UniProtKB/Swiss-Prot annotation:
Localisation per UniProt entry: Cytoplasm
Region (Catalytic): 242-533
Lineage: Bacteria, Pseudomonadati, Pseudomonadota, Gammaproteobacteria, Pseudomonadales
Residue ranges constituting the TGS domain according to the UniProt record: 1-61
Gene for this chain: thrS
Species annotation: Ectopseudomonas mendocina (strain ymp) (Pseudomonas mendocina)
The name this protein goes by in its record: Threonine--tRNA ligase
Length: 640
């Protein structure tokens, strides 16, 4: 009979097969009441599942991250229960867990409205209050098919067809409603009280716009009402910081239907963009990169040789001319190999670091586009390092150091680093993978910072390092990457003359720090709520006169600051000074300079910040020196 080993090493023996819940009951009533599911020998199971052999067991409760996922998945099923009660003709599709929530795709003959969402949420709350048990039944495949056929759930039947090897399937019953799932799920609806439906959108069956359109209901669920309230508050703050809203408020950019996924940069936004580009250009030059420029439109022959045509063609914009097929480049890598291939390269030429602010275009689905965060036309701070295998560790270590410095300059210091290792389907010998993963791991260790493995998440040809930033709202943004690639040099016949006078393939390290400029600027807008640090602000200082008598000195102050390399503007409108101050505060200009008669006499400016802090009156030269200090600190000003 089973002996159960618990996480603390203690053991409990039973004289009969025992469920996860029964083990929890043997430990204590409090734990039993909180039990959602279990992990038996590392595998998640339902609380009702029976253990009949010796095993390790971890009880999963709402306090566990895995517990939250189970709550959210069960809430998705609860959406199905409520929808089928309110709209019996609706057909249920899929309801997975996503980051901080869940959704359910539903086929129905009309779009859901906000009133529908409110009704569904109300019915879900009523069902939760019934505290009914969720019943699991492992059911033979034929019976599952017959059940869903009798209920007219055609999408469930299609999903079953996708799993030909499954002989039995888990059915989860919410009273009269039933759904198919691997589980686990909550044992009772009392665990689902802290939920909220958040929005409705359209979706396509299997994510393909050629298929029928579905309605997608999004929601979130948490362990308790306190966590839910904190999440709602965070989402409300995120909405206030939405880069699309602030982009319009600060006149940074716009998007329009005639160019979906393409950004129209306005002067203010283009200023921010140029500051980023000039900064990255300087950083890369100081770290041994040489800048190149490659064509936007390239013959399909190159994309076929690189492998992109067979694997990525549907995401490429194509055109034809004079009986030749071309593609607008979706990435820069094959073109950089062409530059490397010009002229004979020696081991003495390596490492060669080619950088490009490369404009790329990808035919993203229209439903996936999101402001400037997810676009079709974008520019990357892209670079490729061609090096020997022995140079990989140092190049990776230098890149990690550089990347963390850049993020700190933008005000990001909470960085997660992950090493994605060999997937099941891969090319190359085990020895090559060992060396590649070892070099990247050693480089990460040299940083002195914590990092973690992502087993099996590497590309089929090599491991990679990923950098994820956490912003002021606690959201994670995956930005930087370093990808080890011996494959593309092989496909595109890149080589160098080694010390032994034989030709060898270089290792190619694909790397980016910001990712796309568009997405990174969107992140900065939301992180700072539009209140950019002085070095990034489109206008760093605005000079305002009180009356026309101070206009000449105001113009002189503007000219002096601009000639000193700052971005200053003058506001000479015949408006009250309070009105001007309020307007430029709303425009989030870092420094507001007021000039009255006394300032003209003393050739000074009265300085206040956009936060309303009065810095007093000071000579213009002194203000310029202080502004220079703020600019020099970049985004580190709040971190020191």
């Amino acid at each position: 009979m089973p002996t159960i080993t618990l996480p603390d090493g203690s053991q409990r023996s039973f004289d009969h097969p025992v469920s996860v819940l029964e083990v929890a009951q043997s430990i204590g009533a409090g734990l039993a009441k909180a039990t959602l599911a279990g992990k038996v020998n590392g595998k998640q199971v339902d609380a009702c599942d029976v253990i009949d052999t010796d095993a390790t067991l971890q009880i999963i409760t709402p306090k566990d991250e895995e517990g939250l996922e189970i709550i959210r998945h069960s809430c998705a099923h609860l959406v199905g229960h409520a929808v089928k009660q309110l709209y019996p003709n609706a057909k249920m599709v899929i309801g997975p867990v996503i980051d901080e929530g869940f959704y359910y795709d539903i086929a129905i003959d009309r779009p859901f409205t906000p009133d529908d969402m409110a009704a569904i949420e109300k019915r879900m709350a009523e069902l939760i209050d019934k505290d009914y048990d969720v019943i699991k039944k492992m059911t033979p495949r034929a019976e599952v098919i017959e059940l869903f056929r009798s209920r007219g759930e055609e999408y469930k039947l299609r999903l079953i067809d996708d799993m030909p090897d499954e002989k039995a399937m888990g059915l989860y019953f919410h009273e009269e409603y039933v759904d198919m799932c691997r589980g686990p799920h909550v044992p009772n609806t009392r665990f689902l009280k802290a939920f909220k439906l958040t929005r409705i959108s359209g979706a396509y069956w299997r994510g393909d716009s050629k298929n029928e359109q579905l309605q997608r209901i999004y929601g979130t669920a948490w362990a308790d009402k306190k966590q839910l309230a904190a999440y709602i508050q965070r989402i409300e703050e995120a909405e206030k910081r939405d880069h699309r809203r602030i982009g319009k408020q600060l006149d940074l950019f716009h998007l329009q239907e005639e160019a979906p996924g393409m950004v129209f940069w306005h002067p203010n936004g283009w200023t921010v963009y140029q500051v980023l580009e000039q900064y990255m250009r300087q950083v890369q030059r100081e770290n041994g990169y040489v800048e190149v420029r490659t064509p936007q439109v390239v013959d399909r022959i190159l994309w076929e040789r690189s492998g992109h045509w067979s694997n990525y063609a549907e995401n490429m914009f194509t055109t034809a001319s004079e009986n030749r097929d071309y593609a607008v480049k979706p990435m820069n890598c094959p073109c950089h190999v062409q530059i490397f291939n010009q002229g004979l390269k020696s081991y003495r030429d390596l490492p060669l670091r080619l950088a490009e602010f490369g404009a790329c275009h990808r035919n993203e689905p229209s439903g996936a586009l999101h402001g400037i965060m997810r676009v079709r036309g974008f520019v990357q701070d892209d670079a490729h390092i061609f090096c020997t295998e022995d140079q990989v560790k140092k190049e990776a270590a230098d890149f990690i150091k550089l990347t963390l410095q850049v993020y700190a300059d933008f005000g990001f210091t909470d960085i997660a680093m992950k090493l994605s290792t060999r997937p099941a389907k891969r090319v190359g010998s085990e020895e090559l993978w060992d060396r590649a993963e070892g070099a990247l791991a050693d480089a990460l260790n040299e940083s002195g910072l914590a990092w973690e493995y992502q087993p099996g998440e590497g590309a089929f040809y090599g491991p990679k390092i990923e950098f994820t930033l956490r912003d002021c709202l606690g959201r994670n943004w995956q930005c930087g990457t370093l990808q080890y690639d011996p494959n593309l040099p092989e496909r595109l016949d890149a080589s160098y003359i080694a010390e032994d006078n034989n030709r060898k393939r270089p290792v190619m390290l694909h790397r980016a720090i910001l990712g796309s400029f568009e997405r990174f600027i969107g992140m900065l807008i939301e992180h700072y709520a539009g209140s950019f640090p002085a070095w990034l602000a489109p206008t760093q200082a605005v000079i305002m006169n009180i009356t026309d008598k101070q206009a000449d000195f105001a113009r002189e102050a503007e000219k002096t600051l601009n000639q000193s390399g700052f971005r200053a503007k003058v506001d000479l409108r015949n408006e009250k000074i309070g009105f001007k101050i309020r307007e430029h505060t709303l425009l989030k200009v870092p420094y507001l300079l007021v000039i009255g008669d006394r300032e003209v006499e003393t050739r000074s400016v009265a300085v206040r910040t956009r936060e309303g802090v009065d810095l007093g009156s000071m000579p213009l030269e002194q203000f310029a020196a202080q502004l220079q200090q703020a600019v020099s600190r970049r985004g580190r000003q709040d971190l020191e």
